[in-house]
Amino acid sequence: MAKLTKRMRTIRAKVDVTKEYDINEAVALLKEMATAKFVESVDVAVNLGIDARKSDQNVRGATVLPHGTGRDIRVAVFTQGANAEAAKAAGAELVGMEDLADLVKKGEMNFDVVIASPDAMRVVGQLGTILGPRGLMPNPKVGTVTPNVAEAVKNAKAGQVRYRNDKNGIIHTTIGKVTFEADQLKENLEALLVALKKAKPSSAKGVFVKKVSISTTMGAGVAVDQNTLSAQV
């Protein structure tokens, strides 16, 4: 096991791993522990009451956070005709078909999100081995394969996060930067949890959201008491 640095020992000493913190206390603790020399992201891990081995219990989707993620998102769109003009007007950095596919094949992928209209999937389908491993392959389940590419671009730019449970039934995503106001982080977390609960598989029984933990990029996880979140959650 790797030896913990003095900084990490100091950070971990501030967190009671047996306690679920009030959301405001949890956020304050994160900000106190964020001592890295860069602006750290605030990440969340949500343990779901699902059996991830069963395909009908897997959770996948996307939602727009009310205060965004704090990242400047570059968007590539595979489409043509009027949709291409609409995508450009919505702020997409790269728009095209075969020409855009050629850039991807050359390894020129200066973008964070890929969106495609249904008619463009014949082109995008050839790029699965490149885009797939990078988590960039468009998928209708997360709204990145859609006839309304302009709306998808706006959502991506506005701070849409995509989520998908891992093999242990845990969702990992980001809800902003440590420089966000406490209320902004709280509202982003609440928006994510509302979206997750709406996506609850009908076959999942019992408590759906079992545990919520937040952390900064270089910090320790802090468990959140869900009873201190908004009533809508």
UniProtKB/Swiss-Prot annotation:
GO terms for molecular function: rRNA binding; structural constituent of ribosome; tRNA binding. InterPro entries: Ribosom_uL1_bac-type, Ribosomal_uL1, Ribosomal_uL1-like, Ribosomal_uL1/biogenesis, Ribosomal_uL1_3-a/b-sand, Ribosomal_uL1_CS. Keywords: Repressor, Ribonucleoprotein, Ribosomal protein, RNA-binding, rRNA-binding, Translation regulation, tRNA-binding. GO terms for cellular component: cytosolic large ribosomal subunit. This is Large ribosomal subunit protein uL1. CDD domains: Ribosomal_L1. The keyword Repressor applies. GO terms for biological process: regulation of translation; translation. Binds directly to 23S rRNA. The L1 stalk is quite mobile in the ribosome, and is involved in E site tRNA release. It comes from Vibrio cholerae serotype O1 (strain ATCC 39541 / Classical Ogawa 395 / O395).
